[in-house]
Swiss-Prot record:
Changing residue 330 to L: Greatly enhances DNA binding activity. This is bZIP transcription factor 16. A motif (Bipartite nuclear localization signal) lies at residues 307-323. It comes from Arabidopsis thaliana (Mouse-ear cress). Its main location: nucleus. Residues 305-368 form the bZIP domain.
Length: 409
């Protein structure tokens, strides 16, 4: 949809731009077509993050006001439910779209872009014309954005995930969200940039070399890009877009090294181990503030050692209390056994005493019975009836008989 709208708007705006001079070579006509395709977005002046800087920039003193690193309508955090802005729009737009024209009285090296009075964004190279010298100067200015696009094509493709194939639409940004602006920007102008880079033999850089140069920092293509490679770094470092992470887990600011920064952040080292689990460090990544990345393990080991010592101490205390309780019970049982033994001894002594008394009575009874057996049986006394009392008359007669018997003898 975005590419169709860009083509329609480019067809409508092609008559407004003046035609190139007849003395220009055929190679200069291709940049103009690419520039007109880049001018398709009418509100591109509102999305610019940097102003154009011509090649003879040299060492320009910094202005009192800083560069507008962000758009006027961009938020630090995107609203809820909307994908975050990609990194493509944060880079200088000279590689993908043309810069708006500046008024005649404005400062040529001004860091702020100024729209034209008629409200239409036009290429600064097309505003000059009339003489051969002006035509040559316009050709140089028209070639400038295209060279910048060839130089920064590798870095933009690396950011947007494109592999120099115009058929693929991989609008995934660095933080994993789907970006529509990156898709429209890369698909709308990558075809013209790829064609110009292949047809132009003076550049000497293809897509792979541009990617290698952009990965190395983009310093090799600094003069061809028309701007120093330093402004790219503050964009990704000064204006971080925080991704929506899980609750309770602090996420690092997203940049080109999002994977290394996220997995290398010491989030697990700062959280104490709840169940004694040691966080596994990522090999090859050293956490900030430590040389070997293992300073958290001794702390966890000390914590586990303290818990182990506390458990041992509590076990010792419980064992000592149980031993004391058992010893007290044993002492009580021993005292009770001694008391019972004493009572048993006393009872046994009393039983023995009663037995001896019983034996004495038994012997006395037997002696008395023996004495009675010596006497003859009496007539009036029956020995069998012990309980029967003898008659007094009979006893008196028996006594008289005994006395008479003794006298006779």
């Amino acid at each position: 949809m975005a590419s169709n709208e860009m083509e329609k708007s480019s067809k409508e705006k092609e008559p407004k731009t003046p035609p190139p001079s007849s003395t220009a070579p055929p190679s200069s006509q291709e940049p103009s077509s690419a520039v007109s395709a880049g001018m398709a977005t009418p509100d591109w002046s509102g999305f610019q993050a940097y102003s154009p800087m011509p090649p003879p920039h040299g060492y320009v003193a910094s202005s009192p006001q800083p560069h507008p690193y962000m758009w006027g309508v961009q938020h630090m955090m995107p609203p809820y439910g909307t994908p975050p802005h990609p990194y493509v729009a944060m880079y200088p737009p000279g590689g993908m779209y043309a810069h708006p024209s500046m008024p005649p009285g404005s400062y040529p090296y001004s860091p702020y872009a100024m729209p034209s009075p008629n409200g239409m964004t036009e290429v600064s190279g097309n505003t000059t014309g009339g003489t051969d010298g002006d035509a040559k100067q316009s050709e140089v200015k028209e070639k400038l954005p295209i060279k910048r696009s060839r130089g920064s094509l590798g870095s933009l493709n690396m950011i947007t995930g494109k592999n120099n194939e115009p058929g693929k639409n991989s609008g995934a940004s660095a933080n994993g969200a789907y970006s529509k602006s990156g898709e429209s920007a890369s698909d709308g102008s990558s075809e013209g940039s790829d064609g110009n880079s292949q047809n132009d033999s003076g550049s000497g850089l293809d897509g792979k070399d541009a990617e290698a140069a952009s990965e190395n920092g983009g310093s090799a293509n600094g003069p061809q890009n028309g701007s120093a490679g330093t402004p790219i770094l503050p964009v990704s470092q000064t204006v971080p877009i925080m991704p929506m992470t899980a609750a309770g887990v602090p996420g690092p600011p997203t940049n080109l090294n999002i994977g290394m920064d996220y997995w290398g952040a010491p989030t697990s080292a700062g959280i104490p181990g709840m169940h004694g689990k040691v966080s596994t460090p990522v090999p090859g990544v050293v956490a900030p503030g430590s040389r070997d990345g293992g300073h958290s393990q001794p702390w966890l080991q000390d914590d586990r050692e303290l818990k182990r010592q506390r458990r041992k101490q509590s076990n010792r205390e419980s064992a000592r209390r149980s031993r004391l309780r058992k010893q007290a019970e044993c002492d009580e049982l021993a005292q009770r056994a001694e008391v019972l033994n004493e009572e048993n001894t006393n009872l046994r002594a009393e039983i023995n005493k009663l037995k001896s008394q019983c034996e004495e009575l038994t012997t006395e009874n037997t002696s008395l019975k023996d004495q009675l057996s010596l006497f003859p049986p009496l007539e009036g006394i029956s020995m069998d009836n012990d309980h029967q009392e003898p008659d007094t008359n009979q006893t008196g007669a028996a006594e008289r008989k005994v006395d008479s018997y003794k006298d006779s003898t």
